[in-house]
Regions:
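Proline/serine/threonine-rich low-complexity linkers at boundaries of modular beta-sandwich domains
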Residues: 8-20
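Short, solvent-exposed loop/turn segments enriched in Ser/Thr/Gly
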Residues: 23-24, 34-41
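Asparagine-centered strand-capping/turn motif at beta-strand->loop junctions
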Residues: 44-51, 61
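Intrinsically disordered, low-complexity Pro/Gly/Ser/Thr-rich segments with frequent PxxP/GP/PP motifs
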Residues: 66-110
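Terminal connector regions
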Residues: 104-150
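Compositionally biased low-complexity segments at domain edges in trafficked proteins
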Residues: 147-163
Length: 163
């Protein structure tokens, strides 16, 4: 007897050696630089037997880019492999990492309701020696929180505060 599912086919789905997931919805925060920021993490898990490099991440909202693209040293500096090492955006077979994003945009722009990401990855072609497979896709989306960011301001009330 065939099974049934309520899930519908996703015509935009991409098969990637790395699974990406946003753990918590980002909350818009007005920062000291006068810009709005979305600070959040993307978990990356290499579910393949290949060594895969994350080359570039660009946040997108309402079908356009938002914030600066992360690539090269900027991306490497915001990547922490889950074995505690830093200095690489390359994941070996079965490895995982956290990518720390800080997407900033003008206060004049409306806060996005959702964000997605254009992600470029690459890996050695297992069929053609010396060749590299490069893949770019748009996905890894999440809703943006509507909650107001927590504000810490004077005067602070309560016990055990040190000033």
């Amino acid at each position: 007897m065939p099974g049934t599912s309520s899930a519908r086919p996703d015509s935009k789905a991409v098969i990637s050696p790395i699974a990406f997931d946003i753990i918590n919805r980002p909350t818009p925060v007005e920062a000291a630089d006068g810009r709005m920021h979305l600070a959040y993490e993307i978990q990356a898990v290499n579910q393949s037997t290949l060594t895969v490099t994350v080359n570039r991440i660009q946040a997108r909202a309402q079908k356009s880019t938002i914030g600066k693209s992360l690539a090269g040293e900027d991306l490497i500096n915001r990547t922490r492999l889950n074995d505690g090492t830093t200095g690489s955006a390359t994941l070996g077979a079965g490895e995982s990492a956290m990518l720390f994003l800080d997407v900033s945009y003008s206060k004049k722009r409306r806060n996005p309701k959702t964000i997605a990401h254009a992600i470029t990855t690459s890996w050695p072609d297992p069929v053609t020696i010396g060749e590299t497979v490069k893949q770019t896709f748009v996905g890894v989306g999440t809703k943006v929180s509507k909650r107001k960011a927590i504000e810490v301001a004077a005067p602070l009330r309560g016990n055990n505060w040190v000033a």
